Amino acid sequence: MAKPTYIALILCVAVMFGTAACGPSLVIQDVDYSQPIESVLSPDANQEVHDQRFSIKFNISSILREEGVNSVEEIRLIRNAPGFYFVTASGFNNVYVFKADEGELSLKEKINITRDGLSEPAFNQRGSHIELVDLATGQSYNLDQTGIQ
């Protein structure tokens, strides 16, 4: 009588371990997170921007403080293939690169572009990099999450 109980117990344990081993092992590789075109977003009264097309909402107050400005009319946002967000605005000296974490954006890189401020920045998706163009000056920069290429 004890023998079948032990066998049943061993089988149950084996099934539990087998099920646990097969659990969250599904991995999808070579994911391309890139946005084909930039988003141009206007902050609300609370300095929040919301991109409904790509389902992201965040507060830009800390970026404005870092740039030493109180407000902007709009920000430029684009995401590259590895999933990093690039943020800038007219009057900014820098492009901010953020990594998406659970419920937050963490600053990965602050890329200094100019001391005079960007006049009319625009982002373009270029496959291997993000192109930043200042439409007022014609200056162009190739960026990735580590800086200027």
Segments from the language model and where they lie:
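Beta-propeller fold detector
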Residues: 45-62, 106-114, 144
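Conserved beta-strand positions in repeat-built beta-propeller and related beta-rich domains
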Residues: 87-91, 132-136
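Bacterial signal peptide processing site
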Residues: 23-25
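Short coil/turn segments that connect the beta-strands within blades of beta-propeller domains
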Residues: 82-84, 127-128
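Short loop/turn segments that connect beta-strands within beta-propeller blades
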Residues: 99-103, 144-148
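Repeated scaffold domains used in trafficking and secretory/extracellular systems
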Residues: 28, 68-78, 115-127
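C-terminal motif of bacterial Sec signal peptides marking the signal peptidase cleavage site
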Residues: 18-21
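Structural motif
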Residues: 92-97, 138-144
